[in-house]
Amino acid sequence: MTIKTKAELLNKWKPLLEGEGLPEIANSKQAIIAKIFENQEKDFQTAPEYKDEKIAQAFGSFLTEAEIGGDHGYNATNIAAGQTSGAVTQIGPAVMGMVRRAIPNLIAFDICGVQPMNSPTGQVFALRAVYGKDPIASGAKEAFHPMYGPDAMFSGQGAAKKFPALAASTQTVVGDIYTHFFQETGTVYLQASALVTIDASANDATKLDAEIKKQMEAGVLVEIAEGMATSIAELQEGFNGSTDNPWNEMGFRIDKQVIEAKSRQLKAAYSIELAQDLRAVHGMDADAELSGILATEIMLEINREVVDWINYSAQVGKSGMTLTPGSKAGVFDFQDPIDIRGARWAGESFKALLFQIDKEAVEIARQTGRGEGNFIIASRNVVNVLASVDTGISYAAQGLATGFNTDTTKSVFAGVLGGKYRVYIDQYAKQDYFTVGYKGPNEMDAGIYYAPYVALTPLRGSDPKNFQPVMGFKTRYGIGINPFAESAAQAPASRIQSGMPS
């Protein structure tokens, strides 16, 4: 099997990618869609259904894309121009035209990384640096974590001495060093500058974090990091008869995820009488109408699946570092003066929402180390709010929503907010919400992946009992989660189960 380069694929499919009268495909997406075309062509060459006489006859009666007859083969220029070169013997180009129209309309191309699959299974590998000599040991901590600071004593004093962890009711000794793991920032070492007893009611991680921060702000506990004394370092690892003093070690592991192609399929049956009457009365073709219905429904369902998985895998907003003290976690309440920061009119309260969105976007960068959030999925009402407010540093003006498209009959892409966030409308939202996400400059830099395998397979037959025609479509694709997406889980084994969401 010959593997084509990116340039070769773009050159081969350029006429179809840039065909006059076809919906425009952004340059950044052309290489991906060219790969999808290549996978589709490979399926044409091996699958018999594309050469089935009845399917070819049905498609030939209504599709305007090129249908190549005899042994001519086909080329992208003919498909793009809608030119036929002979009697219909196979429908590959016709299906390719349908793929060309439908695939770029998937929302996955805008908010997911798109990685076309070459086979029904794919693999994602993640290399992780780990503290300790056994990278797969239970409780092994991941190093170089974007969310958690380094263990600043691991190569220093911490290698020679184990420090006690702070807990509820701990009584400190002046000058002693203690350790604590903050949920949001990781391991720290704290030296007691005064005698203090940790509050006995700090009996869970959140309360303990708050209590220790209070003592740090009071100056009772001071963050510290030190190397070991030379006299200690000289005796490390059994030197000169010393014992129980090994060097601290680090290692790495390579985790593998498997992504498997799954299928969607729909069929439609109709009577000969319906087809005849539809053609005679309305001048419509039953095959054409039903094929459009089936293909559109499959596309809408994939769009819904992608949005659902993004919302399901996202963290609850307005929590942790993005929660304003005194306000309710997970909810931005326009009736809460803390959330809207004492706004005097609606325009000011809308600007408070913009600030909350910025906080969520920055938190994505802190937790992933990749970049700030750059797209938003939101319900219609939220998009109307975003469209109605001035995003500049100015008076909080409020007016008609003229800046965005909020009509989902036209497009689910609303526009660009403040020059930095691409906004998409969830037209089927059950309640008002917004989700902030990040997709980087290339298709590998995303939190979730859409992996198309075979974009569209047409099927046609007749019911053996009543001889009425039946037609159907299949599509195969995978959905994968970035192995680094769950940033807060520092122990790698806890989040590497499978690349498939479940």
From Swiss-Prot:
Keywords: Capsid protein, Late protein, Virion. The keyword Iron-sulfur does not apply. InterPro entries: CAPSID_Myoviridae, Gp23/Gp24_T4-like. A proteolytic cleavage by the prohead core protein protease gives rise to the mature major capsid protein during virus maturation. One of its GO terms (cellular component) is viral capsid. Belongs to the T4 phage capsid protein family. Major capsid protein that self-associates to form hexamers, building most of the capsid in association with pentons made of the capsid vertex protein and one dodecamer of the portal protein. The major capsid protein self-associates to form 160 hexamers, building most of the T=13 laevo capsid. Folding of major capsid protein requires the assistance of two chaperones, the host chaperone groL acting with the phage encoded gp23-specific chaperone, gp31. The capsid also contains two nonessential outer capsid proteins, Hoc and Soc, which decorate the capsid surface. Homohexamer. Interacts with the portal protein. Interacts with the capsid vertex protein that forms pentamers. Interacts with hoc; one hoc molecule associates with each capsid hexamer. Interacts with soc; this interaction reinforces the capsid structure. A total of 960 subunits of the major capsid protein forms the 160 hexamers. This is Major capsid protein.
